A protein has these predicted regions:
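Proline-aspartate-enriched helix->loop->beta-strand connector
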Residues: 27, 42-52
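Hydrophobic, Leu/Ile/Phe/Ala-enriched alpha-helical segments that form helix-helix packing faces
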Residues: 22, 26, 43, 101-108
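Short, polar loop motifs at secondary-structure junctions
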Residues: 36-37, 53-58, 72-75
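Short loop/helix-cap segments at secondary-structure boundaries that form the rim of catalytic
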Residues: 43-45, 58-65, 78-81
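Ser/Thr/Gly-rich flexible loops in soluble cytosolic domains mediating phosphotransfer, phosphorylation
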Residues: 66-117
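Short, aromatic/basic amphipathic alpha-helical patches
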Residues: 17-22, 60-66
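Short, charged N-terminal beta->alpha structural module
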Residues: 1-36
């Protein structure tokens, strides 16, 4: 499974920590990070199953299997989207993101065609 992490340059350290943590805790995943400015190019070349970003999908709406808008600010809501289903959460712990990754991986491994995010 491919996971792309995209944040503003001002949150580069946050992005790098997420990339390392997910890579260590989910070693079977191919994890990459980029800036928001590089997102469009990376979506095309890396073609991730899941995007974790500080922003909602405005680059290719509906074309991704899963998108997790993970706010770097604890008082701002985060939003998860999987197969078109969306839900919001406030200041989610890492375990919640890892559980979401596991759910995405199961659907990808089962070969289901996903979109809507």
């Amino acid at each position: 499974m491919r996971i792309l992490i995209c944040y503003e340059e001002s949150y580069r350290a946050y992005s790098d920590v997420l990339e390392r943590a997910i890579g260590a805790l989910r070693p079977e995943a191919d994890v990459a990070a980029c800036s928001l400015a590089e997102m469009g190019e990376q979506l095309e070349s890396f073609n991730p199953h899941l995007v974790v970003s500080s922003r909602p999908n405005t680059v290719d709406p509906g074309a991704r299997a899963a998108w997790y808008k993970l706010s770097p600010e604890p008082d701002e809501p985060s939003e998860a989207c999987l197969g078109g289903r969306r839900w919001r959460t406030l200041n989610p712990p890492l375990e919640e993101l890892l559980s979401f990754i596991d759910e995405v991986e199961t659907l990808v491994r089962d070969g289901r065609e996903l979109g809507g995010c």
